[in-house]
């Protein structure tokens, strides 16, 4: 029996006791809710940016009373690979911390260098060191000279607290789980909701987790793509806004709203990853990362005192060589005066990615029978206008 349970955990399969099936869940656009004016990419995902890959490892095991160090387990890891061989072909990058009650390791080097040279990993708070170890082991396997005749590395690992549903003291995400997520990362459609690092997350008093979206600019504006991936674990129910409608205040009666906060819930956190194929440098990507915070605000967040809101942006348009052979190397650079369409696209895609995390998440029962209810899609759509916004040109 123990062997079978262990196999289920390693396989990352969701048990029926812990989460409802995804059947019937829909992305917000499939509910008829159109966010913003720009069109999404073919997948409406961060993987619409060429070369970007995403992988998950979902861990769920046990139910009932919390046994610290044993379970129940409702957690996982999500990885974003900016491009193949990112160690030798680094990507320009920038970051922004909206509120720092949390951690994203490796940001000091990103800020200093202006580039990113390894995959990004998302997980729960107490699992950060083990996940960092997994990223390092995977990188050393790919590049055996790391730390010997080559540089060392400081992985980028971002956390949100899933302890309201998960046995966080158990630190159940292993080195092998991280390596499996990296090995399985793909450039296709991205699983959303109760998956990977989002397995135990709660957002706006509903089940949250992983969400993604993208925007494709017109050829006149450069034809660039912006993709967003979030791990949503933030906000209180009365704050939730969907496409300008105060859904959180309308969803429940005042008494129900007072009970919507899950026992042990903290102020929460959100991690936002921005990817683009527009030729931006680290300074411009930091500016883009700041604008993602506006998309977060459009869903109702005010970045509360205890919230950890971290944003990392990178561009795949240029290659920063590992060891340049010459003193200089070429980089294409978009003029700042042409940033506005990318700014608008980033805000829109961030807003939609957060909403996708909510509408794709499934109800989860976690430790001590704490229950995170998925937002009711019928109730949600009943609160929204039947007519979508007019399709107008945001840059006439």
Segment roles from a protein language model:
Residues 3-13:
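Bacterial N-terminal signal peptides
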Residues 1-4, 350:
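Generic alpha-helix initiation/capping and coil-helix boundary signal
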Residues 13-21:
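Signal peptide processing junction and immediate N-terminal pro/mature segment
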Residues 20-396:
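Alpha/propeptide regions of enzymes that mature by internal proteolysis
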